[in-house]
Amino acid sequence: MSLFDYRVSELHSLLHKKEISVSDLVDESFKRIHEVDEKVQAFLTLNEEQARAKAKELDEKLATEKEFGLLFGMPIGIKDNIVTKGLRTTCASKILYNFDPIYDATVVERLNEADAVTVGKLNMDEFAMGSSTENSGFQLTRNPWDLERVPGGSSGGSAAAVAAGEVPFALGSDTGGSIRQPAAFCGVVGLKPTYGRVSRYGLVAFASSLDQIGPITRTVEDNAYLLQVISGLDPMDSTSANVDVPDYVSALTGDIQGLKIAVPKEYLGEGVSEEVRQSVLDALKVLEGLGATWEEVSLPHSKYALATYYLLASSEASANLARFDGVRYGYRTDHAKNLMEMYKQTRSEGFGNEVKRRIMLGTFALSSGYYDAYYKKAQKVRTLIKQDFENVFEKYDVIIGPTTPTPAFKIGEKTSDPLTMYANDILTIPVNLAGVPGISIPCGFVNGLPVGLQIIGKHFDESTIYRVAHAFEQATDYHKQKPTL
């Protein structure tokens, strides 16, 4: 039995009783990484020497101090678009292959203050643009449940590492589903918090009005502990919200008696596989048995979400990625004769095809003559999508549906058709456009592959999402299933 089969509260208790040490936890993590990561390829960079040194320091602290936080000594993996001082951060892009940050992201600072131990940086789609982690500039991460299938994306490395038992926790980022979709594919728990709940300072920007950092874990309880630590106002991020952070773990009462659930007909309609639809209906029966009620509703503007998202996200990306020019950091071409040629060649050689595709789309949408027809119209539709959610939440506590239309697809199956790949996020994108929180939890299996249940809540009401997710988790055993590697 692995130490990471225990919940974090159980590991904390074992540390408190001196039955295990922090070094034991860190050793367990690296042992597992060395055993299975050659197959899974979740990690881009390991932090082994520094992690072991920190473990020794924390063991000394453990010997003298009686009180310490729940994340004390816990190994964690960080998605490679979150900057870590002195630890290479590449965004899985060749243009940043040698970037060594000089500061920590706010979430990393908060983890360090909580005495968590960073064991390494995790693979992703380049600059978080993708749904399969096939767009990484360095390696192909595989799904631990079936090594011939994708782990999802863009936080595929984070979800795969947790599912494979390499770390008990990981951080990901979610712009259009990039935490929830890989969590669903890998059979783990992934939360996209409300926009503004978690600081984005130190998150390399893709689409600034959509990006949000969040936790990926094996259980809902562990997820709540991690969100507790990373949440809260940050003066370094002007979009960080000055909203009190509740005690998320206290919300895990298991009581959902009288809870009102909305199920959008658009989320169980065309494009969603029959097996996934049935898994969601079965999950709703479980929640009914626990005292909740559900009704079908409509989110009428959901059909425009995909087009709206790709116009807005690509427009923001075209501006955000202009900073990668070969002058200040990262890759610089050797084949340029003058400054302008250096800019062009550096970006052409450094960025992958999907990143270049989205930069071009965004530049087009923002260009003179097209701004009103595309970007401005997309912003108006985004407002309508947000209003759809607000209307439903006037009557219901949460919205529930599948996280993805299908389970994990095969590697290479969708790479030649970008539109088919984009459609994989059709159920997660509206949540980002509305800025509300959403979680994916395991709710079944189809042919041995995990299926994710998405629970969506009101602005800054992650507590209710956690309460529902935890109640379902306690009534089922899907979260206890593990892949065989």
Curated annotation (Swiss-Prot):
One of its GO terms (cellular component) is glutamyl-tRNA(Gln) amidotransferase complex. GO terms for biological process: translation. It catalyses: L-glutamyl-tRNA(Gln) + L-glutamine + ATP + H2O = L-glutaminyl-tRNA(Gln) + L-glutamate + ADP + phosphate + H(+). It is an enzyme of class 6 (ligase). Its EC number is 6.3.5.7. The keyword Nucleotide-binding applies. The active site is at 79 (charge relay system), 154 (charge relay system), 178 (acyl-ester intermediate). NCBIfam families: gatA. The keyword Glycoprotein does not apply. Belongs to the amidase family. GatA subfamily. GO terms for molecular function: ATP binding; glutaminyl-tRNA synthase (glutamine-hydrolyzing) activity. Transmembrane segments: none annotated. Heterotrimer of A, B and C subunits. PANTHER family: GLUTAMYL-TRNA(GLN) AMIDOTRANSFERASE SUBUNIT A (PTHR11895:SF151), TRANSAMIDASE (PTHR11895). This is Glutamyl-tRNA(Gln) amidotransferase subunit A. It comes from the Bacteria. InterPro entries: Amidase, Amidase_CS, Amidase_dom, AS_sf, GatA. Keywords: ATP-binding, Ligase, Nucleotide-binding, Protein biosynthesis.
